Structure formats: structure tokens, C-alpha cells
């Protein structure tokens, strides 16, 4: 799923820089607004 790929990118960038990517956060917010589950509600995080 596209959401999973975005989450993976955020995790990789967070590990590299200690910071989450603002662009990915915006894209993720847009997906959540379209009805995708928010990734922070997923139990496997």
C-alpha cells in the first residue's frame, strides 16, 4: 500500500536525520483525510 511505503520512507529519514520529513507528513495527512487509516493507529508500530 502507498501508506506503508510513505511510513517506511518517514522511518528511514527519521533514522538518518533524527527528524521526520515534512513533505511526507503532509502527504500522509492527505491520505488520512481521504479515508486511509492513520498509521499511528496500527498496532505493529
From Swiss-Prot:
UniProt note on regulation of activity: Ion channel activity is inhibited by hexamethylene amiloride in vitro.
Region spans: Disordered: 1-45
Biased segments, Basic and acidic residues type: 1-16
Comp. bias (Acidic residues): 17-27
Subcellular location(s) of the protein: Host membrane
Protein topology in the membrane: Single-pass type I membrane protein
Record note on modification: Phosphorylated by host CK2. This phosphorylation is necessary for interaction with human BRCP and degradation of CD4.
Superkingdom of this protein's organism: Viruses
Pfam families attached to this UniProt entry: Vpu
Any one biological process term the GO annotation gives: viral release from host cell
GO molecular function, one term: monoatomic cation channel activity
GO-annotated cellular components: host cell membrane; membrane
InterPro entries (UniProt xref): Vpu, Vpu_cyt_dom_sf
Residue(s) carrying Phosphoserine: 17, 21
Keywords for this protein: AIDS, Apoptosis, Host membrane, Host-virus interaction, Ion channel, Ion transport, Membrane, Phosphoprotein, Transmembrane, Transport
Nucleotide-binding in keyword set: no
Subunit structure: Homopentamer. Interacts with host CD4 and BRTC; these interactions induce proteasomal degradation of CD4. Interacts with host BST2; this interaction leads to the degradation of host BST2. Interacts with host FBXW11. Interacts with host AP1M1; this interaction plays a role in the mistrafficking and subsequent degradation of host BST2. Interacts with host RANBP2; this interaction allows Vpu to down-regulate host BLM sumoylation.
Domain statement: The N-terminus and transmembrane domains are required for self-oligomerization and proper virion budding, whereas the cytoplasmic domain is required for CD4 degradation. The cytoplasmic domain is composed of 2 amphipathic alpha helix that form a U-shape.
Further facts: HIV-1 lineages are divided in three main groups, M (for Major), O (for Outlier), and N (for New, or Non-M, Non-O). The vast majority of strains found worldwide belong to the group M. Group O seems to be endemic to and largely confined to Cameroon and neighboring countries in West Central Africa, where these viruses represent a small minority of HIV-1 strains. The group N is represented by a limited number of isolates from Cameroonian persons. The group M is further subdivided in 9 clades or subtypes (A to D, F to H, J and K).
Protein's job: Enhances virion budding, by targeting human CD4 and Tetherin/BST2 to proteasome degradation. Degradation of CD4 prevents any unwanted premature interactions between viral Env and its receptor human CD4 in the endoplasmic reticulum. Degradation of antiretroviral protein Tetherin/BST2 is important for virion budding, as BST2 tethers new viral particles to the host cell membrane. Mechanistically, Vpu bridges either CD4 or BST2 to BTRC, a substrate recognition subunit of the Skp1/Cullin/F-box protein E3 ubiquitin ligase, induces their ubiquitination and subsequent proteasomal degradation.
Family: Belongs to the HIV-1 VPU protein family.
Name recorded for this polypeptide: Protein Vpu
Encoding gene per record: vpu
Amino acid at each position: 500500500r502507498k501508506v506503508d511505503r510513505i511510513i517506511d520512507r518517514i522511518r528511514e529519514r527519521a533514522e538518518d536525520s533524527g527528524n521526520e520529513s515534512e513533505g511526507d507528513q503532509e502527504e500522509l495527512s492527505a491520505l488520512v483525510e481521504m479515508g486511509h487509516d492513520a498509521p499511528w493507529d496500527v498496532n505493529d508500530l
